[in-house]
Amino acid sequence: MTQPGQTTTTSHEAIDAFKRIVGDEHVLTSERATMPFSKGYRFGGGPVFAVVRPGTLVEMWRALQVSVDNNLIVIPQASNTGLTGGSGPGFQDYDRPIVIISTHRIDEVHLINDAREAISLAGTPLTHLTDALAKHQREPHSVIGSTSIGASVIGGIANNSGGSQIRKGPAFTREAIFARVNDDGKVELVNHLGISLGDDPEVALDRLQRGEWSPEDVTPAPEDSNETEYAEHLRKIVPSPARYNANPEYLFEASGSAGKLMVFAVRTRTFPREVHPTVFYIGTNNTHELEEIRRLFLEADMPLPISGEYMGRSAFDLAEKYGKDTFVFLKFMSPALQTRMFSFKTWANGLFSKIPGIGPTFADTVSQAMFSVLPNQLPKRMMEYRNRFEHHLLLTVSESQKAASEKMLKEFFAEPEHTGEFFICTSDEEKSASLNRFGAASAATRYAALKRRHIAGLIPIDVALRRDDWNWLEVLPEEIDDQLEVKAYYGHFFCHVMHQDYVAKQGVDLEALHDRIQHLLEERGAKLPAEHNYGRIYKLPESMEEHFKELDPTNTFNAGIGGTSPHKDWA
């Protein structure tokens, strides 16, 4: 059996073919050179035969043809965020060598229909799309969060990323252009982009990259709005989750494909940019008060808030201490610079990982030491609330909703049984609160990396709770709690999507503990995962496995995802 990193005569021929297509410098084969692509941000990592970095859609198409002709497993990768390890290989019993086709160099955006829609090519990062739309007073589906680690537009679509924008729902489109490998093992191009590009694959992809089409070649845009049908779906307080990765309503071709197709471009809606939103910072020691506020706003006869983000005190503290570098870069510099620094950190960690006594977290250790000398970066009122309240909610509303929302909150907290408080953020407090909330995920990862010699590891849980669940914040049994060093809770509260990070004590069986926590959540009617997809840590349900088999009948793409067979033809 050929292992992922092994080579054969045929494999050498494939390397030569890749080099003819993309150039020698864009075909990586050494362990050090491929590690930034093969090792995930949190999970995943294993040997690969090669990383190929095409610079055009046509090169991408040709590299795929070579891979299929040489019986290689193909992992399409736009941005190796690897939150659950799904953007790279795992340590599985693969029967073919693995090639990662990294699309990072293909990052163009084409705005169409008066910027009401965007065509994002294979490797377009969210930061590029955000910048392109800002000139037109528009914004994409995702506004902040995964943008800070360089996440891509297509990665969001492929994984049904939800994000903080509660009016918009999961990242989803029915319009994409992609390649699949059919039952006969042949590569075919499918153009469902809604743009006529011709029948020849290479001509079509070249025209797409150059934006060469006329207005009559493009189907009309949908009606403009600052929300999708998800908004009304979310308002229903019913015993089922609002959104989760296995929801069939959000699985269509590229959407939710999890790397089981080679996606060249997606067409997505854009939204009017929010001008002068208001952020209410809410603190309480009673979880039911936050749920009452959630239902109050969901049931109100007014537009939904823009976002409602939860953060517990433990997550707050982790973000303040271990996410300070991310906070500073994003607050005082730019997401684009943070993305470059993230890439540099990954490269540096890979470079120093083989040096005895240094290990795989060199860049994290240096960054943590440098930024720890800075004083606390958070505003005074936020720190006061941190000391007084266990639970924090960042409620963001449109300018037109400010007065009504403030009135609702004042009346709510005026009732004697309610013990929490709120304040309206200044512009500085608004930015700081948002960055601290979205720094929580990277902070938990940083903490676990720096403490790796003294802990068993990190268990991240990504869960969609029932929309009617009053007891949304779990209380773990003592026998589980005793196995944990740290636990942190944060999430998209109005959607009842929680991110729950657990750092397990040394000697704990991580897989068994993960399964136990997942079982407890599922007993409560929750669905896992919610928005980070299955990757290498969640087992696919049968319905998802059948869906992936329809997309990829020969198991050419991202084989082994979600605990499925890594073998050809799903053997």
Swiss-Prot record:
Where found, per UniProt? Cell membrane
Question: What does it catalyze?
Answer: (R)-lactate + a quinone = a quinol + pyruvate
Taking the first listed entry, what is the main subcellular location of this protein, grouped into a coarse class? membrane
- Superkingdom in the source lineage: Bacteria
Single biological process term from Gene Ontology: transmembrane transport
In Gene Ontology terms, what is one molecular function of this protein? Answer: quinone binding
* Binding positions for FAD per the UniProt entry: 78-82, 86-87, 145, 152, 162, 263
Q: Which UniProt keywords apply?
A: Cell membrane, FAD, Flavoprotein, Membrane, Oxidoreductase, Quinone
| Membrane topology label | Peripheral membrane protein
Show where the FAD-binding PCMH-type domain sits.
44-273
Q: How does activity depend on temperature?
A: Optimum temperature is 45 degrees Celsius.
The cofactors it requires, by name, are: FAD
Tell me the protein family, please: Belongs to the quinone-dependent D-lactate dehydrogenase family.
Protein known as = Quinone-dependent D-lactate dehydrogenase
Q: Which gene encodes it?
A: dld
